[in-house]
From Swiss-Prot:
Keywords, ordered alphabetically: Cytoplasm, Methyltransferase, rRNA processing, S-adenosyl-L-methionine, Transferase
Family annotation (HAMAP family): 16SrRNA_methyltr_H
GO MF entry, a single one: rRNA (cytosine-N4-)-methyltransferase activity
Subcellular location per the Swiss-Prot or TrEMBL entry: Cytoplasm
This protein's GO CC annotations: cytoplasm
Name of protein: Ribosomal RNA small subunit methyltransferase H
Region (Disordered) residue spans: 1-21
Positions with a binding annotation for S-adenosyl-L-methionine: G52, G53, Y54, D71, F98, D119, Q126
Originating species: Granulibacter bethesdensis (strain ATCC BAA-1260 / CGDNIH1)
Hydrolase listed as a keyword: no
Family assignment from sequence similarity: Belongs to the methyltransferase superfamily. RsmH family.
Amino acid sequence: MNALPIRTAAPSGHSGGHSSTGTHVPVLLNEVLETLSPAPGGVFLDGTFGGGGYTRAILDTAEDSTVWAVDRDPAAITRGEALAARYRGRLHLIQGNFSQMASLLTDRGVNALDGIVLDIGVSSFQIDDPDRGFSFRTDGPLDMRMAGEGTSAADLIARLPEAEIANILYELGEERKSRQIARAIVSARAEEPITTTGRLASIIRCVVPPDRSGIDPATRSFQALRIAVNDELGELERALQQATNLLQPGGRLVIVSFHSLEDRIVKRFMNDAAGNAPSPSRYDPRGLVARTEPRFRLITSKAVRPGTAEQNANPRSRSARLRAIECLRRETTP
């Protein structure tokens, strides 16, 4: 296939940037297209539609292809309506979680796919909108809800005990000073509710001094709260199993993740699906059970990372990792 050239992107998004014309440019665009290898007439799922960059590239690359685009954020679906009008009959927008992709698609008569792409995490549009409450760089309401419903980050830190806040920061943000930050949050909320991103970031920065990396001290804590608010790791694990059951032989699952927690889940799942899981001990009774032939093969032996040019153009792409598998056969039902 002919991969599209990557356009220069401004550093304005976690999972993508914007060109000088305002077009959304997703991270690892060339690499995603090359790995997905969309064929003419194929049916694909963009499970994290966002700004529509991957969807647009698939539709432009593969003649007569169809994309079903899912996003939990109503704003993303609204933005996508103009794109759907442009690709009349080829792009179908669905508001919902990618962890529900099986039911969302089967309810619409789609039972098999030629490819799936997932860009895990917060989108550039969400980060760059202060009112969504994802960023510590601009002051706004402490929200972080991707779908705009459920428990907000402000609600979370207002009601959770100190120990639970510390656990979230440590387990989901890998923040070493999680206990000190949790203690500072509980102390601050006793004086006044923490309702803005600016105040929370200030509290964290008073506990965690800046280091030589140049990474803002609030980065890990904000990541942890966002993951907790949106149950991102749970959503990912549920989505992976459904994705593999939807792919037909030759279909590929391509995933771009942005931090080590996600990448570990994806790597482990893909290795297991491809039959590359470590052999059990000969003393483990489970090892006596005959292994079935794997239904998938690894496309990426190791994670694909953005090149220097893309990292320089969009610094937020630096942590991106791409992994992919290809379906060899569909699961047969007895």
